[in-house]
């Protein structure tokens, strides 16, 4: 087919575009062509076309010494885009070394920090990733129209790290920082970054419905536009998954986790892969019947860590997975140990504090002093207040009503299903008084959750008391009967009575047989 037979689908488009170019040439409008050049670089970088990116970048590079250094910088960027992290780092190491003290070194450091921020993130090295990202943002070198996009994506990366770590203050800072970036050209990519950060802020605040809507929209737009590699919307897909979990849409959350897991393999993101593995275990650990499978998987992940020293940054994720399991089986000592060795991870510290609140209730005034600025804080505070019998039944119902109504507005279900059976029963009773389809559905889920939990302590014969279950847990340890008594603050004579009742109810003859039953019920 000849060129003359090809026509534009839009009347006058070809001639109009040609006229724009002719006018730019006539006016010697170099900025017009520079913006076209930059726009093409951006598109190639976001769509994972590293080789084409490098070729296009080289079209503006001369043979001067500075030009040759810039060529190497663009080569490093191209390797980042093509996910060859090792080669990218080797080029950057050489560039930094050879340009020390040179005028072009600040530009090299900007490129290096941008690349290393992304590489360190995907390798799970958050401290270095944050350091490099902030250094790149604060670089004295600016790159014209590319700069707002670079800054936006780096702030988005910082926000993602802080979301994973549950550092709410830093998430809010990112939400503020992104609004301070000027966008005179109306760059869509910067708008996407703003939306992504807003979805992460909403998720952290407990506004799950709004977070889901925004994050899902960003995922659809960016994946349709071919965003891949380090530019893939993994952060927003993570938000979508978290929201689905909080909605108690478990099958959908697991399905999306598998999608993100497959994408992480394609995009060579070790951290996202392990995050998906642990995310799946967290979801499965909500069901007592799956705890055996989850415990086995945790041990398999630990073995992988031991065999591969490069995975050391994933160790806290595996500890996190075990915390979910041990929380479900009420193994407080092990949870405290895991929390203690991950004291530098805000999310793990948060889990530890929450766990201690469940077992060592604060006084009423302390709970009333808790903040309620976000949806999550309001729900959590009123759930805790509803547990104080000293407030009286009417006041307890009022607290729970506030929590439930805010939960319906925010789409928060799972936070209620995590509560003790007494609170679940209160929700069931409340559903009979409030006219809400959402609450009716939550009530049915509460009934199912109580049934699941009860299977854990059904032994076939006469049921053990809660105190007897606590003693049974310790029988599989190396502690003597006297030591168990001291740990649980039980007198010697009372311990003898507990042991006698446990053996009788379980129809066993000795401590070893009782321990085997405890293990089969996943109490230890």
Regions found by a protein language model. Give the residues of each.
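Inter-helical turn/loop elements of alpha-helical hairpins
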Residues: 1-107, 118-131, 162-173, 204-209, ...
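Alpha-helical repeat scaffolds
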Residues: 20, 52-60, 87-97, 127-137, ...
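Short, locally clustered residues in the helix-turn-helix/winged-helix DNA-binding domain
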Residues: 473-477, 519
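Recognition helix of helix-turn-helix DNA-binding domains
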Residues: 470, 478-513
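Linker/hinge segments immediately adjacent to helix-turn-helix/homeobox DNA-binding domains
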Residues: 346-353, 357-466, 473, 482, ...
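Alpha-helical linker/edge segments of TPR/alpha-solenoid repeat scaffolds
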Residues: 46-55, 59-67, 118, 159-162, ...
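Alpha-solenoid helical repeat architecture
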Residues: 29-33, 64-73, 103-115, 142-157, ...
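Residue-level signature for tetratricopeptide repeat
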Residues: 23, 43, 78, 119, ...
């Amino acid at each position: 087919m000849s060129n003359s037979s090809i026509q534009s689908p839009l009347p006058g488009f070809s001639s109009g575009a040609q006229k724009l170019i002719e006018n730019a040439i006539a006016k010697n409008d170099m900025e017009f062509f520079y913006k076209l050049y930059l726009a093409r670089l951006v598109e190639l970088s976001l769509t994972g076309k590293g080789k084409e990116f490098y070729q296009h970048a080289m079209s503006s590079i001369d043979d001067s010494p500075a030009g040759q250094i810039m060529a190497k910088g663009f080569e490093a960027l191209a390797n980042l885009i093509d996910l060859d992290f090792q080669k990218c780092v080797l080029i950057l190491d050489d560039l930094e070394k050879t340009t020390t003290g040179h005028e072009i070194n600040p530009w090299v450091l900007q490129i290096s920090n941008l690349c290393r921020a992304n590489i360190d993130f995907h390798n799970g090295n958050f401290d270095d990733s944050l350091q490099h990202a902030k250094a790149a943002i604060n670089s004295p070198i600016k790159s014209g129209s590319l700069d707002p996009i670079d800054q936006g994506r780096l702030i988005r990366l910082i926000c993602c790290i802080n979301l994973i770590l549950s550092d709410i203050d830093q998430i809010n800072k990112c939400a503020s920082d992104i609004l301070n970036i000027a966008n005179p050209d109306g760059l869509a990519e910067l708008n996407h970054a703003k939306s992504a950060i807003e979805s992460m802020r909403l998720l952290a605040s407990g506004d799950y419905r709004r977070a889901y809507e925004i994050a899902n929209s960003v995922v659809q737009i960016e994946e349709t536009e071919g965003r891949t590699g380090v530019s893939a919307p993994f952060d927003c897909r993570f938000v979508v998954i978290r929201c689905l979990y909080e909605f108690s849409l478990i099958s959908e959350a697991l399905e999306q986790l598998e999608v993100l897991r497959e994408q992480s393999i394609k995009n060579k993101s070790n951290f996202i892969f392990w995050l998906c593995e642990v995310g799946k275990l967290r979801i499965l650990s909500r069901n007592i019947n799956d705890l055996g499978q989850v415990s086995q998987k945790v041990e398999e992940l630990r073995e992988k860590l031991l065999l591969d020293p490069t995975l050391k940054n994933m160790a806290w994720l595996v500890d996190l997975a075990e915390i979910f399991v041990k929380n479900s089986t009420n193994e407080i000592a092990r949870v405290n140990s895991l929390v203690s060795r991950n004291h530098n991870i805000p999310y793990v510290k948060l889990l530890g504090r929450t766990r201690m609140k469940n077992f060592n209730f604060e006084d009423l005034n302390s709970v009333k002093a808790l903040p309620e600025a976000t949806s999550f804080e309001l729900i959590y505070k009123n759930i805790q207040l509803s547990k104080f019998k000293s407030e009286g039944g009417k006041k307890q119902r009022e607290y729970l009503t506030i929590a439930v109504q805010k939960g319906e507005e925010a789409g928060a279900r799972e936070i209620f299903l995590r509560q003790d059976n007494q609170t679940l029963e209160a929700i069931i009773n409340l559903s009979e008084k409030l006219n809400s389809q959402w609450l009716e559905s939550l009530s049915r889920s509460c009934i199912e959750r109580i049934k699941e939990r009860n299977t854990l302590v059904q032994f076939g014969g006469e049921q053990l008391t809660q105190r007897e279950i606590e003693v049974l847990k310790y029988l599989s340890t190396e502690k003597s009967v006297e030591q168990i008594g001291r740990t649980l603050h039980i007198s010697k004579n009372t311990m003898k009575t507990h042991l006698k009742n446990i053996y009788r109810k379980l129809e066993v003859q000795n401590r070893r047989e009782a321990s085997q039953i405890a293990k089969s019920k996943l109490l230890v």
